[in-house]
């Protein structure tokens, strides 16, 4: 049984004012309530109350992972270079990796994620189809050298994460393991009290095919997702697609060259011709692994460079600079058009469908062209959905206008397939006596990030407001200050603890009742029990932290009520 936590002995220092550098609600409140302390940019200490919340979340995750048959392990955070070099992620992760050398000059990294090491572990431990399927997980610190760590524990350079991996001999087995994890994640986030959405996502540097994110809607979120109000479609904006729908372009006239001096931008061109930007074709030049590539999108839309990068990964995508036009007579800056670009690969968004007509650059200084028809006057080498998704864009599933919302990514699940198994030749002996290539899934939950997400969703103007399952205590008993009140508070705390409840009691001497009441709301335990003015009568005040409802109860009534409410 847990002991009663006495605040007179607990290392907790609350603050009245927000940290000067805090922007998000979770950053402000977790620091003010004494849950975390900043050591450096993106590096945080979890203090006693914060560590309890972190552990409670980890325990929920652990219980649900165990329930689907996953086995807990702990792999090293300090990892050798070679596996990540073999997978390509030593280079692909770039500056995001913390790299170091040992005293002998060997290259190492601090693990950002563990697909490579888990693959090698299973290759060593599992040699027959009889050893599979297997699901392994760990709860461990990850390290990523974020360029701009911010928002407190939402985006740190080290963070707590649950990562798990499934290993199967068939695609059907992978689909089953994926479904088990998906269902477990739903249970985990429901138990944590996190409002969440499951959305389609892209796999990014993780690789693989099917991918879904678990997002917690919050104003402080760094992710934007598209939600359909009419059907069940939801996707990260980088995963939203637009169907290619060719149109009949036979009625369009011949290409007409236009004199358009001093119109190198879509805005100046549209104003000069008196046409909407949507009638123009924007041709963005980028470098893909050093090769100049043109990307065509409607003039009133922006290219989503993240989306473009996902489509072209693992290639490196960069915007061109003025120097890239030197010696390129075929590229006229500000007047590029798709027609006649023989030396440049031309990619286009599906909105630039065959048969659509555009006003676009004529590849001559001060000149544009009208009636330039896709499929007639220029060919698209590849169609890629690359525009920034906007509010009201049609739902890919039903056509209703999409709604955009901000959210915090709290989980991500992937069907990796055989990407890493191929890299490390992960085979087992099959039923027919022949090697069978293993197929994998990868599944992550941001444990420390979930603390911040819950804060963003549940806190109010008074402070934190934890769901019971992850709160640092079930009941916060407050002794108003006098000796009799303190004696009653300690007595009822022991009785509540004996009844199986986790109790935090504020017995700090020399602290005013007002400060204690304010701290009880800031700390955010679900139930607050006050030994105050009626202590001599054996009467306490019970307050619900979330609703603010209050009632006076005797000691026995309070114990009965709390044990029933928190059972």
Swiss-Prot record:
Q: Which reaction does it catalyse?
A: tRNA(Pro) + L-proline + ATP = L-prolyl-tRNA(Pro) + AMP + diphosphate
Signal sequence annotation: none
Which superkingdom?
Bacteria
Predominant location of this chain?
A: cytoplasm
What InterPro entries does the entry give? aa-tRNA-synt_IIb, aa-tRNA-synth_II, aa-tRNA-synth_II/BPL/LPL, Anticodon-bd, Anticodon-bd_dom_sf, Pro-tRNA-ligase_IIa, Pro-tRNA-synth_IIa_bac-type, Pro-tRNA-Synthase_IIa_type1
**The protein's Enzyme Commission number:** 6.1.1.15
What keywords would UniProt list here? Aminoacyl-tRNA synthetase, ATP-binding, Cytoplasm, Ligase, Nucleotide-binding, Protein biosynthesis
Q: Which GO terms describe its biological process?
A: prolyl-tRNA aminoacylation
A GO molecular-function term, please?
A: proline-tRNA ligase activity
Q: What is known of its domains?
A: Consists of three domains: the N-terminal catalytic domain, the editing domain and the C-terminal anticodon-binding domain.
PANTHER family reported for this sequence: MITOCHONDRIAL RIBOSOME PROTEIN L39/PROLYL-TRNA LIGASE FAMILY MEMBER, PROLINE--TRNA LIGASE
What role does this protein play? Catalyzes the attachment of proline to tRNA(Pro) in a two-step reaction: proline is first activated by ATP to form Pro-AMP and then transferred to the acceptor end of tRNA(Pro). As ProRS can inadvertently accommodate and process non-cognate amino acids such as alanine and cysteine, to avoid such errors it has two additional distinct editing activities against alanine. One activity is designated as 'pretransfer' editing and involves the tRNA(Pro)-independent hydrolysis of activated Ala-AMP.
From the Swiss-Prot or TrEMBL record, give the protein name: Proline--tRNA ligase
Q: Which organism is it from?
A: Streptomyces griseus subsp. griseus (strain JCM 4626 / CBS 651.72 / NBRC 13350 / KCC S-0626 / ISP 5235)
| Record gene name | proS
